[in-house]
A protein has these predicted regions:
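Rossmann-like adenosine-cofactor binding region
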Residues: 178-223
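Alpha-helix C-terminal capping/helix-to-coil transition sites in glycosyltransferase folds
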Residues: 47-48, 71, 199-200
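Glycine-rich NAD(P)-binding loop of Rossmann-like domains
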Residues: 126-159, 187-188
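N-terminal glycine-/charge-rich "phosphate-binding" loop or analogous flexible N-terminal tail
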Residues: 1-61, 168
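Phosphate/diphosphate ligand-binding glycine-rich loop within oxidoreductases
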Residues: 50-127
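Short acidic active-site motifs
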Residues: 40-41, 61-64, 85-86, 192-196, ...
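Active-site regions of enzymes building and remodeling cell-envelope glycoconjugates
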Residues: 29-34, 50-51, 94-97, 184-192
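NAD(P)-binding Rossmann-fold cofactor-contacting core
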Residues: 166-183
Length: 223
């Protein structure tokens, strides 16, 4: 592997078996681009690397190969969540970590709306009946007026609130602190109200980041 090109080194960490991310041609003109997909290949690629792009949001390879990161300055995750990157050697050091905040808000919100409608309109049984050539009329539920509890009132949760409200649902949020008069939620309740709010919800959406504070919040009492 060339190590004296004079260009800054960028290492791309993908999940094993994933294809090379598109759109890297322009980057290659300005940097030496290396690829890794597991601990072994990352151990080889990391020395001299100044920038990393991580597309595998479940990776454990970086924590294992961290001693090889002798020049690393910046890690960019192409996902919204970065919990796999939050190991002590990284969080306690000077390396900057960024993510793709905002990129997936609309996509995830559309998926949530689709799933709510799927359950309300009983799509699985409709598909099963069609596959069996059974043309059976059934009554389904209306989503309008139902209460959806969105745990996590950040950018993703806020977009979910907007889209669910657009089809007539009543979005309520859970956040670290309660607040009144939110433009996108019927109300935003504090974390200490989770169990109470779960009892009132028709649908529950978890859009909170996985952190030390949120891990385990859906415990036995919540379920």
């Amino acid at each position: 592997m060339t190590r004296d090109s004079g260009k800054p080194i960028v290492t791309v960490l993908t999940a094993p078996g994933d294809a090379e991310p598109p759109g890297l041609d322009a980057l290659r003109a300005q940097a030496e681009v290396r690829f890794a997909s597991d601990e072994a290949t990352l151990n080889e690629a990391l020395p001299g690397t100044r920038v990393m792009m991580v597309t595998d949001f479940r990776t454990e390879a970086l924590a294992a190969a961290w001693p090889k990161a002798d020049r690393l300055e910046w890690i960019h995750a192409t996902s919204a969540g970065v919990d796999a990157l939050m190991f002590p050697a990284l969080t306690d050091g000077p390396v900057k970590v960024t993510n793709a905040q905002g990129i997936f808000d609309r996509t995830i919100a559309e998926y949530v709306v689709c799933t709510i409608l799927m359950f309300s309109k009983d799509f699985p049984n409709s598909i099963r009946l069609q596959q069996n050539h059974q043309w059976k009329h059934r009554d389904t539920e209306r989503a309008q007026g139902k209460r959806v509890l969105i745990v996590g009132a950040g950018s993703i949760g806020r977009q979910i609130a907007r889209l669910t409200a657009a089809i007539g649902l009543k979005p309520h949020g859970i956040a670290r602190a309660a607040r009144e008069h939110d433009p996108d939620f019927e109300a935003v309740h504090g974390n200490d109200s989770l169990t109470e709010q779960l009892e009132l919800a028709d649908f529950v959406v978890v859009a909170a980041p996985l952190t030390a504070q949120t891990e385990g919040m859906f415990d036995r009492a919540a379920f």
